[in-house]
Amino acid sequence: MASVKLPWDLEEEILSRLPPRSLVRFRTVCKHWNGLFSDKRFVKKHLVRARPQFIFLTESKKMYSIEIDLGGTIEVREVPYDFHCQPMKKNFTTIMACDGLLFRDFWKQGVAVWNPWLRQVGWIEYEDKGFRFCGVGYDSCKPDKCYKILGYFNCTRRLSDSLQEGYYQAAIYECASQAFKFIDTPNPFNLWPNKDPLSVNGNLYWLAHNHPETLEYFIETFDFSMEIFKPFCLLPCRKDFGSNELVLAVFKEDRFSLLKQCFETTKIEIWVTKMKIDREEEVVWIKFMTLPTTNLPNLDDTYCCSSYFIFDKTIIMCCGDYKTGATCIYMVRGDMFKKIQINSGIFQFSYCVYLPNLISVPFESHQV
């Protein structure tokens, strides 16, 4: 029986639905398939269909991906890596996602840029080792994506012959030019978050509150195009200072979702923004759902920051169980509730939500 050759359009459609770990194995099967990895249109099409997962950076210096099936099962994979160095102190190691790539900060050493599924690792090393990493973005107004790192230096200034004070000097490290650019702004990090910021469409966003003036919660942003800090929008719970636990997340790639848990009742509300965040319009929040209070943890009591994402009307939350010290995944959709404890000895100290993808590392890289 003669083999049947599928139309190329149909082949491509099938391949775009496969996870990156499967596609990577197929690179040697067919030159045409291998060419898809450098096809920007296909890479974007594949990314749109990606299901979010958690990437963990652990105390044992191992990294894991946590893939969640909506039926209520999870798959934990150790992710191989080969970085230039190891962290000096675990508390100064951060991992965050920016447009499909992972950026891992090594305090006083540099930043690794990584796609775990393509097994590519790049390295950014700045000459001044006193630069403290805060987040990654780029100028979205330019056609070419040139990454920039926002951070700061700990500085001192003399007030008199016998008195001096410390202050933060904000700066941007431009990866293309390998140069620092200082930002002239007073007290830039007064509103800096205790949770890692989100990188969306080139800019950084995080939760802040105006305390003690108005007690309003809002989203602060750093705009890499204008190179300024500025408020983005108020939150729907803007007057409830001190009575809620708030967690900000990305919704549908270009919108925000906000999880609000009341300290007293542990009731959880999920809000989402109506429009894309890059539109020049007033931000409108819509209540997306209310979650039951009996089974979900009190997020204020968890031993590390909680994180979550929404996929196919399912809330998937990750946090550490304060009593057992274990990492737990919670899944809520309609009447369905599942709590899954990860029993592989993972005690995380840094993690983020990540979309598996085929985006190549733009910096000098090597295969892991």
Curated annotation (Swiss-Prot):
Gene3D superfamilies: 1.20.1280.50. This is F-box protein At3g17710. CDD domains: F-box_AtFBW1-like. Pfam families: F-box (PF00646), FBA_1 (PF07734). Residues 1-46 form the F-box domain. NCBIfam families: F_box_assoc_1 (TIGR01640). It comes from the Eukaryota.
